[in-house]
């Protein structure tokens, strides 16, 4: 397209003289940039581009910069690259615009390649282009650019330093990230937030909290980063405590904060707090985006309120694949298997392409509903219809489905014939089904395989012990328990949580660590006496 336009207007502008005055050129430049910025559709760009060429602005760095930016923003990065390629001797700003375009379009390799070409063409980089290319870098390229940064004297650039810290943190190079942080002259809340993320990425949540406490002025992003770090490191109670502290400090939360807190609520089953966050989102007039909506559906589903999950799903305007995946998973969790299948059909009819997560959710729905024929049909159509290669989770769903309907031998043959090695979860699922359906012989065979294949966990011992016990083989059941004890394997203690006044309290079996343990155990004894009294009253009434 560009070459044809150039032919119409007489070839590259490098060889043409613009007869207009500088004043007129500046006026046209301003107009063209304004028109480009107002462009909302790529279909309108070619006519504007033609005018740019006719008015000799196709080599004007200011106009070309805006043209590249607009094309990239409108998802036409190839058009943007054609524009860039037509420029004689592009400067560092045009390289920056084009690299940004590649990176924002997910073409990181092209962005890095163009940066290397810029260096090869002796165009001196600045901190802006370095920051842009760092967004596309892996650890290896980051180290190369870090060496260039030091050589070219950009080591003190704040934006470059923050971006390199982020890459080092995500790559597990915590020492390098900390070194860059320590060398920064201005370690304000922004730099601290990046370092908090680095600590969280690497699992050093204690260090992240210590740094967070040292930050004097914390903004919303800093609070959210710390809450997110706690959630990602499974410190859900601490995440909720920090959110409450954030509210007491009158720091405004945003949708990212809300999603982090909703994730913690989902994990802990904190329905009331989740409802409060939902009302907070509505009161703050936050948009019910996919990001927030999907988190709400997940929270309500996992906290037991599937009706509210349905309502949120219905009112969401722009659903995506994740929305459907979350809703289908929630329905499966609550035994609404037929409804889950209907949502899947609606998803496909609306043009959404199912992915691996979708099909795991759908197979789980079939499993929970005992829908064997539909489940097998879905599994057999994964590769053929949806071009999704079955993974171990999908095979595990079929084993669970066959086990639930009592077809244990068929499930075992299925495991024997799958192209991947079954894990302890898949084998444990079938062992559990053997206990339910009383198939001692197959249960022993699976247990033997579990003991031989890897270090068995407490669940394997407990399942086999219970299988023997349910069949009246008390001696064998006791021997398995003793073997478990002799191997030094301990069963994880039972755990329960209750939510009181938006606070989560966790209790373990035989727990004596709670600060109010004396009052708790006293109350439990009182409740036990009341229950025994009520039981005696019922016995008297029934005549026992």
From Swiss-Prot:
Residues 1-21 are annotated as: Disordered. GO terms for biological process: chloroplast RNA modification; chloroplast RNA processing; mRNA processing. One of its GO terms (cellular component) is chloroplast. Residues 502-532 are annotated as: Type E(+) motif. Disruption phenotype: No visible phenotype under normal growth conditions. Residues 426-501 are annotated as: Type E motif. Pfam families: E_motif (PF20431), PPR (PF01535), PPR_2 (PF13041). The keyword Isomerase does not apply. Residues 1-25 form a transit peptide. Keywords: Chloroplast, mRNA processing, Plastid, Repeat, Transit peptide. InterPro entries: E_motif, Pentatricopeptide_rpt, PPR_At4g14850-like_plant, TPR-like_helical_dom_sf. GO terms for molecular function: RNA binding. It is found in: Plastid, Chloroplast. NCBIfam families: PPR. Involved in RNA editing event in chloroplasts. Required for the editing of a single site in rpl23 transcript. This is Putative pentatricopeptide repeat-containing protein At5g59200, chloroplastic. It comes from Arabidopsis thaliana (Mouse-ear cress).
